[in-house]
């Protein structure tokens, strides 16, 4: 998905303020229109857009004796993803926007954020509080460490997305800048800031990141992917 398509979708979308409203009162036969109502005669939950809920409460104020509204976003352009479509392990607190691809057996940990247009390969783990920016492409059997940032490239639209090839480990709190390609079977050390392409089969570290060694048997042992964590 290119940046221009995403930008047009955001521009043209009807901005919404999704909300959940808890209501009490004489609710039997309450006409909620396009809003979703779940409840009984004297208590229920209304789910929908904030403005529509406000209008309903104003219209039915004599019947609704009490209410509380929880706002989930404000003028949001795009919804969150439907998590049921993924054959992956997605833990509570992960935030995944719509139009994200996630491969079978991937693991998305608590607090991870994945933006629109990103692609997560099969068996890849996105660890706690990692941020995967828009249009970033991450291959199969990778591990993106806790707090790592893979830069997104929706703005400016001409920017090239980050590409991380298969079997790559990105250490905790590392940063991969826009347009960088990380070659297969490589390691980005914790805290590194990657500003240039990483050759396949290498280990990079530092700020800015530089090649410090080749990927060898010792490195392979220390960065081994555990398949049991990816079983569904």
Swiss-Prot record:
**Keywords of the record:** Acyltransferase, Amino-acid biosynthesis, Diaminopimelate biosynthesis, Lysine biosynthesis, Repeat, Transferase
User: Per the record's keyword annotation, is Zinc-finger included, yes or no?
Assistant: no
Which InterPro entries does the record associate with it?
A: DapH (IPR019873), DapH_N (IPR013710), Hexapep (IPR001451), Hexapep_transf_CS (IPR018357), Trans_hexapeptide_repeat (IPR050179), Trimer_LpxA-like_sf (IPR011004)
Q: Which PROSITE patterns match?
A: HEXAPEP_TRANSFERASES
SUPFAM superfamilies, from UniProt?
Trimeric LpxA-like enzymes
Q: What does this protein do?
A: Catalyzes the transfer of an acetyl group from acetyl-CoA to tetrahydrodipicolinate.
Which pathway, per its entry?
Amino-acid biosynthesis; L-lysine biosynthesis via DAP pathway; LL-2,6-diaminopimelate from (S)-tetrahydrodipicolinate (acetylase route): step 1/3
**BP terms from Gene Ontology:** diaminopimelate biosynthetic process; lysine biosynthetic process via diaminopimelate
Q: What is this protein called?
A: 2,3,4,5-tetrahydropyridine-2,6-dicarboxylate N-acetyltransferase
Taxonomically, which superkingdom?
Answer: Bacteria
Q: Which organism is it from?
A: Kosmotoga olearia (strain ATCC BAA-1733 / DSM 21960 / TBF 19.5.1)
What family, per the record?
A: Belongs to the transferase hexapeptide repeat family. DapH subfamily.
One GO MF term attached to the UniProt entry = tetrahydrodipicolinate N-acetyltransferase activity
List the catalytic activities from the record.
(S)-2,3,4,5-tetrahydrodipicolinate + acetyl-CoA + H2O = L-2-acetamido-6-oxoheptanedioate + CoA
List the EC numbers from the record: 2.3.1.89
């Amino acid at each position: 998905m290119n940046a221009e398509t995403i930008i047009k979708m955001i521009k043209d979308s009807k901005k919404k303020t999704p909300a959940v409203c808890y209501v009490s009162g004489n609710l039997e036969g309450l006409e909620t229109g396009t809003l979703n109502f779940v409840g009984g005669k004297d208590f229920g939950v209304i789910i929908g857009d904030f403005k529509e809920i406000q209008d309903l409460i104003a219209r039915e104020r004599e019947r609704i004796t009490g209410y509380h509204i929880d706002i989930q976003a404000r003028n949001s352009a795009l919804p969150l993803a439907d998590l049921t479509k993924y054959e992956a392990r997605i833990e509570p607190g992960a935030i995944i926007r719509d139009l994200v691809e996630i491969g079978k057996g991937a693991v998305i940990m608590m607090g991870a954020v994945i933006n629109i247009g990103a692609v997560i390969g099969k068996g890849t783990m996105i660890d706690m509080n990692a941020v995967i920016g828009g249009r970033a492409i991450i291959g199969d059997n990778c591990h993106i460490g806790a707090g790592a940032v893979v830069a997104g490239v929706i703005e400016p639209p001409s920017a090239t997305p980050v590409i991380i090839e298969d079997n790559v480990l990105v250490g905790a709190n590392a940063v991969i800048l826009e347009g960088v390609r990380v070659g297969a079977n490589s390691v980005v050390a914790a805290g590194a800031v990657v500003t240039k392409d990483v050759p396949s089969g290498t280990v990079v570290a530092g700020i800015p990141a530089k090649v410090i060694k080749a990927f060898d048997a010792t490195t392979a042992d220390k960065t081994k992917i555990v398949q049991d964590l990816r079983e569904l």
